[in-house]
């Protein structure tokens, strides 16, 4: 360095000179230094840390560090480890020229620009400090992208990397790059990359590629005249990646969609697919968040079907559509509005075209729209409801229930006397009801009025610390605008006035604590009994069935049971409920429920459904089945529930249910659902179509990893009917994800008799942080 060399030469000369010579030479050197310092033409100096440039920019102070600096007029020159800083920008190079008037930096040799999450390297560059605009040649750069985890998006910590012959920085977040390739893979040997003669990178928005192509292992596989890929969270409008696939029932599948996001709070997707063997489908999704707390989602899926050909028979058309709408919003005054609508043309359409087994086997269609407001212990609701349950698909039979409109008001228990333990509550509603069914043709004309008022008085009593008795008294008055007579609707009003008594008895709770090491266990036994008495229903068969309120019957019963809980506490953490086991049964003093029970057929009453959802009453009986509900939750790796119904009158199990979630090792998982029921026989015989005396089905999924986990991921699943001895659904999914991309393959089979017997083959290529290409979309779940 010039300064260092100068100081070394001066010291050597002084060692061999006389004092007078030294003084003269020192004076001469000082004069020369003074002349250099005051000369306006040029100036030299050692690298001075954080030396401000002479002209300050409008946005603040720019500083420069270098091994050597000099000034020639308005131009500053710096060489060797040059470091220019301005606001959040840092420019490094071997040589820099800075024009103090135009505030332009011209850099050469090992140019590096760092700005927030941007890192750009180039051979040379021209950069404007004031505007942030610049041009770089022979560029390499990385831009960090933050993506939130999504079920269908592979996430990689790698930044977006690009190389280009030239990059124009248009502003702090926009780059126009030429003859470039981009990837999120490691730059040494990228698995994939986009090549484009021209591309525009808008940070936190998108990357737009013009006349480019997608390359896999440097081999072009897809030409892209114009493509947009997302960068971070912002959405961009445009055409989606085409869908390609093949199934045994649809044939070859070719489809595409267009995505439109005109506003930050609204977007829409419209698409269509051609099925070579069947016809074509249409789909659409609309999402909107118009204001805070409001959600609006709408979707449509339809198929125009040429028909399914089976064994040379004439084509059977299974086309139709399903449209869904969901709207939720908080309104002024504490009101909440909800509309959850579902319109389905037929059960056959759902069975034939649903993407997952869970959707296909759902035979219910529910619609609800309501306004609700909770205030001061009261709840006020206005609703319109619809429920349709398909019993068979071919021929199609169903039961339809509608309520429109309905107003309901209720209250929680409230004490009107400060010194007396007496609490009052009530429930009241009025509305119009409709019922229609195809099995035994029946339909109410229009809507039938139904109103109810039910005040309740509750008196909690405590006898020391060992016994609590809580009696409740309810008077329920219900009016129906019509009634049933011999299975025929009669347009004649009818009142149902009932007196109801409930006595809840809570006995002493037994508990014991076991201590061993760092883990403490607590065993709790909670016995209980509830007595119920209902009188006044009388002729149960006259009342129309619109919902569970209409299945109220006379009863005189006692329910008794015991709940055992095992708690576990490790160290100083909170106690967790490890095991819960509930045993319960009912004894009926009135085995005919006031004459409502019809022998020889399943009877569905409110008091029976409250115990178990599996019908068991086809004759007069005193004892109900014993219901056992065992739940084991030892931690995050294991969760299971066993439900068993044992009928002592028939001396056999009538229902067995198992739900299991288990993670035996690291990312491995097992999910299982099994239900076996013995349905009551129907009278008269023979039973109706599709009736099964015995039902025994199992569904299971097991595997390792998930769709977006790095490495190998495998999922296997099946649904098997033991009675029909047939698989209804099978799935095999294998995927491998690297640091920047992944590939997945899937096989699915649906078997629904003559309606659908289909093999599906799907493939997907996942591009980390950007999206995916292929027709493997949704992962199967059991619960």
Sequence positions of predicted segments:
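Hydrophobic alpha-helical signal peptides and transmembrane signal-/tail-anchor segments
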Residues: 3-9
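Detector for intrinsically disordered, low-structure N-terminal pre-sequences
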Residues: 4, 22, 36-37, 53, ...
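Bacterial N-terminal signal peptides that target proteins for export
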Residues: 9-30
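Bacterial N-terminal signal peptides
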Residues: 27-40
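Charged (often Lys/Glu-rich) extended helix/loop segments that serve as interaction or gating elements
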Residues: 46-183
